A protein has these predicted regions:
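Gly/Pro/Ser/Thr-rich low-complexity, intrinsically disordered segments predominantly at protein N-termini
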Residues: 1-192
């Protein structure tokens, strides 16, 4: 096995081959449809935002829905992803390692993965019928980019500062600032 950055080179795999292979690994891997990609660690802010998100969701979700952290995989467009959090409102098999029918997925953006999260994963989430909303949370400022279904369209909106994240599919309205309480953000860039 040859590794290149965070990509394990094994040759093209099928989804079933990947799932069988990954269950035997100590580390977590995403699957891009061809090969395993090792999951990397995050910053303290990334972890704090994701933790605050899960805590905020858990106490507000409508009955029948449950939030899961980043150690549970989802299947999207023939690929395997580990979002930072995901909500399902469907019954689950507690022994499974695959979350069925995610309704809302959340990614905390990192410098090293933001382009994949914004483009590749967003397209995969849009192609997954159960996913109604993809929330991408910033790590360097209070902000989110939200894509949601509007009929046949996948429509993006940017939320900043005092905005409220409205997610009717899971019965939640969440002030964005709640996810950043106590988190030290870098100073805003100036146009000097």
């Amino acid at each position: 096995m040859i590794t290149r950055m965070n990509v394990v080179q094994r040759g093209p795999m099928t989804l079933d081959e990947f799932l069988a292979w990954e269950r035997r690994q100590e580390l977590r891997y995403e699957f891009d449809g061809f090969e395993p990609i090792a999951m990397t660690g995050g910053t303290l802010n990334h972890s704090a935002i994701a933790t605050d998100l899960v805590s905020a969701l858990r106490g507000r979700l409508r009955p029948g829905c449950r939030v899961y952290r980043s150690d549970v995989k989802i299947l999207v467009a023939g690929r395997v992803r580990y979002p930072d959090a995901a909500v399902t409102c469907s019954p689950v098999d507690g022994q499974s390692d695959i979350l069925p029918n995610p309704v809302v997925v959340f990614e905390v953006l990192s410098a090293s993965t933001a382009s994949v999260d914004r483009v590749t994963k967003n397209a995969e989430y849009a192609a997954t019928p159960s996913i109604q909303r993809n929330v991408m949370l910033e790590q360097v400022r209070i902000g989110a980019t939200v894509f949601a279904r509007d009929g046949a369209n996948w429509v993006g909106t940017v939320l900043l500062d005092d905005a409220v994240l409205v997610m009717p599919e899971i019965g939640i309205e969440l002030p964005l600032r709640d996810l950043y309480a106590g988190i030290e953000l870098p100073p805003p860039e100036t146009d000097d």
